[in-house]
Each structure stands twice: as C-alpha cells, then as structure tokens.
Amino acid sequence: MNDKLKIAIGTDAFPPTTDGISNVAQSYAEKINQGLGEAVIVTPKNPNQQDYKYPYEIFRYKSWWIPTKEGYSVGWPFKPELHQAIIDRHFDLLHSHCPLATSYYFKRVAQLHPIPTVLTYHTKYEYDFDRCIPGKPAKDFAYNFMLKNISAADEVWVTSAGTVESLRRFGYQGDYVVMPNGCDMPKVDVPQSQVDIIRRKHNIPDGVPVFIYVGRMIWYKNIRLILDACKILKDRGEDFRLLMVGFGANENAIQKYFRKLGLADKIIYTGKVLDRAEIQGYYGISDLLLFPSVFDTNGLVVREAASCATPSLLVAGSCAAEGITDDRNGFLCLESAHSIAVRLQQIMHHKDYPHRVGKAAQEEIYISWDDAVRRAYDRYHIVIDNFKSRQ
C-alpha cells in the first residue's frame, strides 16, 4: 500500500471567504502537505482570491459571485471539462467539506471515474435552507439536492455525534463516522503583556469580569440570548465587559439591539479579526467564552478558547457541549437568557473558579489539528481499501 496519498480537499468557501469550514479546509491541506502526503484545495473561483499566498495547489472552478459581507461564491461545476481536470490529477480520494456545489462536483467525477469520496458534514444546513429559501417547491428541491450529494459519498463523517440529527432531517439514513475537528491555535498561557495591550486598547478596567463571543454575527447562533442575559446582569448592578469578535449578516442589527438595551458601555464590538495571534489575545483576557449556539455541530471556538485555558458556557445537550462536564472542563446552562445570567453570576465573582475549569478544558478537550488530521488521514486508507474491495 502506498502510504503517501494525494487528496482533493473540496470546500465551497476558501479565503478570502472566511468561515469555520474554510478554516478546516486550510488545516487539512496544511497538515497533509507537511509530510503525510499531498493535498490540493478544490474550491470555486473568487474575484478577490490571492492563492499565491498558500504553499499548496489551489484548483479553482467556475462560480457566480455574491456581493455580500461574507463574500461567498456559488460554485458552478457543470462543465464536462471540469470533471476531466479532476480526473487528470490522479487523486487517491476526494474529500468534500460541504454537501453543496463541490460535493456535486465530486459526485459527477466519481460517476465518470472510479475514485472514493468522503463527505464531512459540518453545518446544520436546515437552518439556512428554512430561513433563506422561499416556498415549499424550492425548499424540497434543495433538500433533495443535498440528500443526493450526501448519499453519493462512500463514507460520511460528522464532527460530533449530535450532528447526525441534522443528517436525518435531510433523509440520510446511512452510516457515519465521528471525526472531530482540531484547533489551529497552540496551547498557550497568553502573556500578561498581550493582555495589557488589549486592556488598554479597549479601556477595560482591571478586575472587571470579561466575557467573549467569537464567531459569525448571525441571530441563529443565539446571540440574542447573550445580549438579553447581559441586560439582566446590568439591571442587577453587575459590572462586566463583553467582547464580540467577528462579523456577519446580522451585525448591524445586533449592534442596534444591544444599544437599544442600554449595553453600549458594556459591550466592545471589535468586528472582523483575522490575525490568529490577536484572537488568542482576546481569549487570553477573557474569563469565559459565551457560546449558547445550538446551531453549530462542533464549535471550533470552544477548542480555541481551551487552547488559552479559557472555559466556555454552553447549552446542555448541544453539539458544542459534547465532551463537556459541567464545572469540570466547562459550564452548562439552559437555552434561555435567564439561565445564562444565573450561571454568569455564579461564575464571575470567583476568578479562580473559571481559571481552574479553563485549565481542565485545556488538558481535556483541546485537540490539535496535527492529531485530528493524522486520524483522518489514517481513515482515508480504510476508505480506499473498502472502496477497492467493492470494485
């Protein structure tokens, strides 16, 4: 068996479009090319692409550009010559990280040429489908398109066991493998000098509890619950600061809402931050990550926070809370603003409490991308062997 594999890493989002899946694809490509084998990114064209920055091949295919803040391109992989372009690269396996355009692309290639395919299902797409697609006929078409792409994969991976519920909603009844994501941030004790820089930059008083939210600014991540909980705390006379790091479709509405609640003096809105070391600094100054999302299937930010020994407050039973034991390596709450506020009051006045739990999170739930991709790469060999045995 040839241990060195050539893998196509398919993703519908890649820089300059940035989201969780984009980060995952970059990590897979980087780690595979650092000695395991060869990885090529397969992704739609983007008018702002700067692929020369990356030390591995990036194959771009035709797309339609959507001029939004997120900057997504819609892949258009329907030209026959595009299928041949993948075949001619002699990949050992095609691994898609999105069950939309790129998965359709890989499905068509596999129909023309025998090659094993893997799909990692990262996101609860029904949220976006139900929110954005008007009318039942169009929605039914989208669900069916997605199901066909998922079912075409030789092996389906999920990043958490709870993600399977979303797969079943699309009608997928097949088997799956749980393959957790890693974290691209190393374990660190953020230097006090870096913490002081952030404290001065945002005028954060010493001794005031600092919470943080990192991620897309979109309502269905339960950001309203965070803001309502902060309102409860302020009404109870509590002092604190909430750092909001990220951007997204609802960012203007979110800023308008927290100002309406009278929280402008408590919330620090940083906007888009791409520098990973800077983001670690924000985690380092924070006592607690607030992440009550029930939308996310894995919650990369929970592991990012853990890399800095910052614990997370999560909704009990959510995918993001898998592996979390309350008061040991994280904190759990109900999916309500009141429950979040109660937990914050229990935590915020005991500095050593979140520090101890954060250290446990750093040791128990942190997974490096080296370990995560090594595990995935070993699984590639099994997928290939199973595929060959069926031919």
Q: What is each stretch, according to the model?
A:
Residues T43, E57-K62, K139, Y143-Q194:
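Donor nucleotide-sugar binding/catalytic pocket of nucleotide-sugar-dependent glycosyltransferases
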Residues D128, A316-D327, F331-L332:
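Short acidic/histidine- and often glycine-rich active-site loop of Leloir-type glycosyltransferases
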Residues I150, K272, Q280-S286:
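Short alpha-helical donor nucleotide-sugar binding micro-motif in glycosyltransferases
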Residues Q255-V273:
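Nucleotide-activated donor-binding/catalytic signature segment of Leloir-type glycosyltransferases, i.e.
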Residues V294:
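Aromatic "clamp/platform" in nucleotide-sugar-dependent glycosyltransferases that forms part
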Residues P311-V315:
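Short hydrophobic beta-strand element within catalytic cores of glycosyltransferases
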Residues D326-D327, F331-A337, Q346-K351:
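Conserved acidic donor-binding segment of nucleotide-sugar-dependent glycosyltransferases
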Residues Y353-I367:
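A short, well-ordered alpha-helix in the C-terminal region of glycosyltransferases
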